[in-house]
C-alpha cells in the first residue's frame, strides 16, 4: 500500500503529536537540509530579505517542504549564482501523522478488525503552520529582488492553501529595520556576528562601554 495523499492530512484536527518514547517507529522526514546557499555570508553582505508567509492554519508535509526547497534553490542558483543568496526553511516537520491500514484483498474481512482498535501506525511527519507564520526566507543583495519574488512564487505551487510573498523591511535575517541598521552599526549599538547581530544595550558596566567605543 502506497503513501496516502497529503490532502488527507491538510487540516490541523488533532493535538500536536511529536516523536517520543510513546510514539516510536516514525519514518525520517524527507527534508534534511534547512539552510542553503552562502550560509556563512556576513550580515552586511545580504541586506534584502524575502519571506513566504502562510495565509492558512494547516499542515505541510515534509515531502512538500523538500519539493519547495529544491524548486526555490534551483531557480536562485540559476539566476543569482551559488554564492549570491542564503535561503532558510523556517518550518520543521515535528508532528507525526498516522494511518490505520486497511486490507483490500479477498478474504480481508476475516483478517482485519475494521474500526475496532483504529489508532493507526506512524506514516510520516508534517509541519503545523499558523496564519502569518513564515515558511521560507531568502536573503540576498538588493538587485536580486525580482529573483527572490520569482523563486518564492515557484515554491508556492508545492503547498496547499494560500501563501503570500512579503519583502521584509528588516535587514537580512535580523530583527532591525533596514533604514536604521547602518546607523546603529556606525554608533556601535549593533555588532555584526555571522548572519546575525549582537545588540549592545545602553545600560550595563561603563568599563565595557568604554572598551567598545575606544
Curated annotation (Swiss-Prot):
One of its GO terms (molecular function) is structural constituent of ribosome. It is found in: Cytoplasm. GO terms for cellular component: cytosolic large ribosomal subunit; endoplasmic reticulum; nucleus; ribosome. Pfam families: Ribosomal_L16. CDD domains: Ribosomal_L16_L10e. Signal peptide: none annotated. One of its GO terms (biological process) is male meiosis I. Keywords: Cytoplasm, Differentiation, Meiosis, Ribonucleoprotein, Ribosomal protein, Spermatogenesis. Component of the 60S large ribosomal subunit (LSU). PANTHER family: 60S RIBOSOMAL PROTEIN L10 (PTHR11726). Testis-specific component of the ribosome, which is required for the transition from prophase to metaphase in male meiosis I. Compensates for the inactivated X-linked RPL10 paralog during spermatogenesis. The ribosome is a large ribonucleoprotein complex responsible for the synthesis of proteins in the cell. The small ribosomal subunit (SSU) binds messenger RNAs (mRNAs) and translates the encoded message by selecting cognate aminoacyl-transfer RNA (tRNA) molecules. Belongs to the universal ribosomal protein uL16 family. This is Large ribosomal subunit protein uL16-like. It comes from Macaca fascicularis (Crab-eating macaque). The lineage of its organism: Eukaryota, Metazoa, Chordata, Craniata, Vertebrata. The gene is RPL10L.
